[in-house]
């Protein structure tokens, strides 16, 4: 699996900023690009934990309904990069332990996806990892309401995701955009989480089937 992803042993904070600029240049709307470049994007990192046993599946969390931001949404473990974190990998691993109790020694980082930029002003480094098996978790009740697992086989089935359209205004500019939705059981995975999962899908599709 590690050969499929960007290798991130040397992703310093400076390299993260450079990768963000590379991602920004992919925007086709010049006004949107200009607006994003002027705004202060908050550096963040998430862990995409792939649990190998008994079948490959991705750990996801549901945020508590009482939260002020992103209440009830589905997300990966992760958060803002702390000034004491040496790199985005450190952030992703630290946040994962704090949120769901997975220990550092159980996590094997195998690479990263492209930087993901959100409409709410975050630049996210998705760190891909594999975990052989996990028998117990310790959830932070203030950050995580529950966890569940999305089988990779489900993600790779084209029938299990689709696009929706929406629009919003920021600084007087209207943005029209499409976003992915991945319905799974009683969960609706959308927004940045679904976007990063679809980036993972693009890499894995045809490689492990």
Residue ranges and their predicted role:
Residues 1-73, 80-98, 102-112, 116-134, ...:
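N-terminal leader/linker segments that precede catalytic domains of diphosphate-processing enzymes
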Residues 139-176, 183-185:
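NUDIX/MutT-family hydrolases
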Residues 74-75, 124, 142, 163:
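Short, glycine/charged-enriched secondary-structure capping and boundary segments
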């Amino acid at each position: 699996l590690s050969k499929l992803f960007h290798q991130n042993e040397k992703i310093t904070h400076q390299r993260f900023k450079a990768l963000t600029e590379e991602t920004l240049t992919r925007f086709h709307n010049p006004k949107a690009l200009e607006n994003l470049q002027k705004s202060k994007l908050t550096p963040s990192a998430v862990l995409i934990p792939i649990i190998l046993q008994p079948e490959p599946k991705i750990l996801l969390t549901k945020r508590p309904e009482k939260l002020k931001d992103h209440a009830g949404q589905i997300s990966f473990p992760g958060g803002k990069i702390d000034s004491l974190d040496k790199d985005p990998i450190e952030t992703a691993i630290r946040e994962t332990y704090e949120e769901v109790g997975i220990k550092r020694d159980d996590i094997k980082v195998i690479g990263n996806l492209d930087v993901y930029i959100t409409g709410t002003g975050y630049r996210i480094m998705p760190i891909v990892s594999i975990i052989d098996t996990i028998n117990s978790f310790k959830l932070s009740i203030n950050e995580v309401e529950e966890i569940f697992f999305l089988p990779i086989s489900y993600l790779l089935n084209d029938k299990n995701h689709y696009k929706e359209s929406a629009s919003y205004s920021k600084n007087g500019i209207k943005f029209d955009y499409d976003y992915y939705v991945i319905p799974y059981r009683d969960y609706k995975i959308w927004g940045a989480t679904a976007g990063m999962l679809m980036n993972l899908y693009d890499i894995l599709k045809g490689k492990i089937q």
